[in-house]
């Protein structure tokens, strides 16, 4: 099945800004998140598709390659983005780990078949409010996992006994099969590649060396994390086979949409409504910040959509550095539910701005309509 265009997946145009791409990603990631659509394979597939598109289109080099060559740029080993959890975001090991690739579902890495396998890595999806993500927070979580059996101490053998070396493969976990002139290595059919045989298995774990348990963990989320960041808890994954090391637990962060602020990098954005009179005459308006309310001075003759930067009122990144800014967009609010007297006053005001005064009081409108008139005059001349 051919892949959909990444821009189509996110519902953005090809000239969309990084901010628009991130905004689309956050909206779709929340919609198709596995925690909100448990058991829905279609939603899980869409979540992976959205994440893959986001990872490509927010990386300048990958985006340039995709724009030029499409999906072909990442075929034949060109990135491995199909795994769904590779790339993107930041990892923080041991609580701030290294960037990892397609770890989930793997967990069995390194060594020969006869050696006990390291435990599988686990993933936990954690949803945070913007305030929690910005300030940092400690969260208690419950994780169903496999732990070493206390009764047999992870060996799988009944207490007082031990596993014996497999007589078929002599502990190698593999046997050599001859086919004509060729010798082929195959997994030992007796011990199934483990190299050991448990003749008297543990009554509790039935020879597995592990048992199911729900662990309660306290996770410290560092200040400044954002959607896509991952936190590694070393050794908190599934227990390994027959006493082998445990895997890791990766906590994947998703920040909920905020009703006031929108985050882009370390900057915050918000819209603040102002009255028509304040926009024209100037004044002060109260602006919300993560630290409380502050007053913003509004110059006279402010047009709707004008941006104001409040330095140091944004987010301090998880890796340190300067604190971001709060970008405030002023939106001039049209008055509604007017009384008769108010309507009369507005009509008087509008009439006072017409005629020769229009150029002075409404330069943009006057310039626009003069341009429209000239356009049609040129068409008919």
UniProtKB/Swiss-Prot annotation:
GO terms for biological process: chaperone cofactor-dependent protein refolding; DNA replication; protein refolding; response to heat. CXXCXGXG motif repeats lie at residues 149-156, 166-173, 188-195, 202-209. Zn(2+) 1 binds at residues 149, 152, 202, 205. The keyword Cytoplasm applies. Disulfide bonds: none annotated. SMART domains: DnaJ (SM00271). This is Chaperone protein DnaJ.
